[in-house]
Structures are given as structure tokens and as C-alpha cells.
A protein has these predicted regions:
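C-terminal helix/juxtamembrane-tail motif
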Residues: 145-157
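Active-site-adjacent bridging/hinge elements
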Residues: 85-95
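Conserved cytochrome P450 K-helix E-x-x-R motif and the immediately C-terminal K′/meander segment
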Residues: 5-47
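Conserved cytochrome P450 K-helix/beta-meander segment immediately N-terminal to the heme-binding cysteine loop
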Residues: 13, 59-87
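Cytochrome P450 heme-binding "Cys pocket" and the immediately downstream C-terminal segment
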Residues: 109-144
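Conserved, non-catalytic sequence blocks in retroelement Pol enzymes and Pol-derived host proteins
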Residues: 9-17, 103-107, 140-144
């Protein structure tokens, strides 16, 4: 609706809030990089735990993005979680599908932009539904991916 039927362009990104929220919610539930590794460069304390220098630390976006302290009904797809009002009080690293800090994925902004435009173009033309008998299961590898793909039906709008 924000586009009036025309193909989306870069200048439309600020008006594609719902496409952005949908992509962020998909990345919350199934972050492609499900595990990140960091090494402590010096001794530190994290959450009351002593961490010696050179300790490997695993960060698990897949688990953090489902943690009930941060996400109510975490297994449900609810794009509105990422509205401005619902995001403003969320802890900084409750959501980090692209990592964070100085080692955040360089492609973060490009991926967000590309996804918003693609989602908008698809939804302009089709109503998308998950195939009724298809169950999405994650396959853990270097990245998280759908085990048997994602079967959808497309209905022209």
C-alpha cells in the first residue's frame, strides 16, 4: 500500500516498516549465524562470572532470540515485536542476528535494505502462505538453514 503499485526503490525504504519488521522477526527466529565465537583478550567478569584471558566464549543468537526474558511467545512469528514502540526498551543484545560491536557483519545494512525491497515486491504481487503440510525445521551447519527448503503457495493479488 505504501508504494501505490509501483516497484519499490531506495527512497521508499523509510515507508516499508512492515517489510522491515517481518525480516527482523524471521532473523530473530532463524538467525543464519546461529553461533558466534569470541575470545577474551584480557580477564574480565561477565554477569558475576570470572572470565580468564584467552577464554573462548560462545554467543548463541538462536537461543538468545528465544529467551523468555526478552521475547514473549518466542516461537510465534510476530513482526510487530520490532515496531518502534516495542523495540525501544529491549536490551541491546537481546537481538543480534548480524553479531554486534566492532565485529558486526559488514553486510548488515545491505541485507536489511535488500530484504525490505524484495519482500515489498513479492507482497505487491502475491499472497504467500506456508504449504499446509510443510513443517519448517532448521538444519544446523556453519549457518542455520531450512532442512527441506521452505514450501509455500503463492496466490496472485
Amino acid at each position: 500500500k505504501a508504494l501505490g503499485g509501483r516497484v519499490p526503490a531506495f527512497d521508499d525504504l523509510p515507508n516499508l516498516d512492515y517489510a522491515s519488521m517481518c525480516f527482523k522477526e524471521a532473523m530473530r527466529i532463524y538467525p543464519p549465524v546461529w553461533m558466534l565465537n569470541r575470545t577474551a583478550v584480557e580477564e574480565d567478569e561477565i554477569g558475576g562470572f570470572y572470565v580468564p584471558a584467552k577464554t573462548d566464549i560462545l554467543l548463541l543468537p538462536y537461543l538468545t532470540h528465544r529467551h523468555p526474558e526478552f521475547w514473549e511467545d518466542a516461537e510465534e512469528f510476530v513482526p510487530e515485536r520490532f515496531s518502534t514502540e516495542n523495540s525501544e526498551n529491549r536490551p541491546k543484545f537481546a537481538y543480534y542476528p548480524f553479531g554486534g560491536g566492532p565485529r558486526i557483519c559488514l553486510g548488515n545494512s545491505f541485507a536489511m535494505m535488500e530484504a525490505q525491497l524484495i519482500i515489498a515486491m513479492i507482497l505487491q504481487r502475491f499472497k504467500v502462505k506456508l504449504a499446509p503440510e510443510h513443517k519448517v525445521e532448521a538444519e544446523v551447519s556453519l549457518t542455520l538453514r531450512p532442512k527441506r527448503g521452505i514450501m509455500v503457495s503463492l496466490e496472485k493479488v
